[in-house]
């Protein structure tokens, strides 16, 4: 039986085209392409251009990465350069490990 893959919906909040924002986006895209190729949707929101979206989602700092789906919603604020921290913080590493086959 083939298991249906989950789709991950993520939002990345950045403040303009700063080096920190560019680095966060580049790192995140790298992680997503390696770990979740074809099963994710990423929306990048510039809080300087769309402050109302940041306010609605209660974003207080950038960069902030928010996992919307699958539930529960999870957020990581700040540095996204540590792959494992990002995956654990968004509850993605646990899901990845729990779905694997563990044989002794």
From Swiss-Prot:
Family recorded in the similarity comment: Belongs to the KaiB family.
SUPFAM superfamilies: Thioredoxin-like
UniProt protein name: Circadian clock oscillator protein KaiB
Domains: entry comment: Has 2 forms, fold switches to a thioredoxin-like fold (KaiB(fs)) when bound to KaiC.
GO BP: circadian rhythm
HAMAP family xrefs: KaiB
Domain of life: Bacteria
SMART domains in alphabetical order: KaiB
Reported function: Key component of the KaiABC oscillator complex, which constitutes the main circadian regulator in cyanobacteria. Complex composition changes during the circadian cycle to control KaiC phosphorylation. KaiA stimulates KaiC autophosphorylation, while KaiB sequesters KaiA, leading to KaiC autodephosphorylation. Phospho-Ser-431 KaiC accumulation triggers binding of KaiB to form the KaiB(6):KaiC(6) complex, leading to changes in output regulators CikA and SasA. KaiB switches to a thioredoxin-like fold (KaiB(fs)) when bound to KaiC. A metamorphic protein which reversibly switches between an inactive tetrameric fold and a rare, thioredoxin-like monomeric fold (KaiB(fs)). KaiB(fs) binds phospho-KaiC, KaiA and CikA. KaiA and CikA compete for binding to KaiB(fs), and KaiB(fs) and SasA compete for binding to KaiC, thus the clock oscillator and output signal pathway are tightly coupled.
Subunit-structure text: The KaiABC complex composition changes during the circadian cycle to control KaiC phosphorylation. Complexes KaiC(6), KaiA(2-4):KaiC(6), KaiB(6):KaiC(6) and KaiC(6):KaiB(6):KaiA(12) are among the most important forms, many form cooperatively. Undergoes a major conformational rearrangment; in the free state forms homotetramers as a dimer of dimers. When bound to the CI domain of KaiC switches to a monomeric thioredoxin-fold (KaiB(fs)). KaiB(fs) binds CikA, leading it to dephosphorylate phospho-RpaA.
InterPro entries: Circ_KaiB (IPR013474), KaiB-like (IPR039022), KaiB_domain (IPR011649), Thioredoxin-like_sf (IPR036249)
Origin organism lineage: Bacteria, Bacillati, Cyanobacteriota, Cyanophyceae, Nostocales
Annotated keywords: Biological rhythms
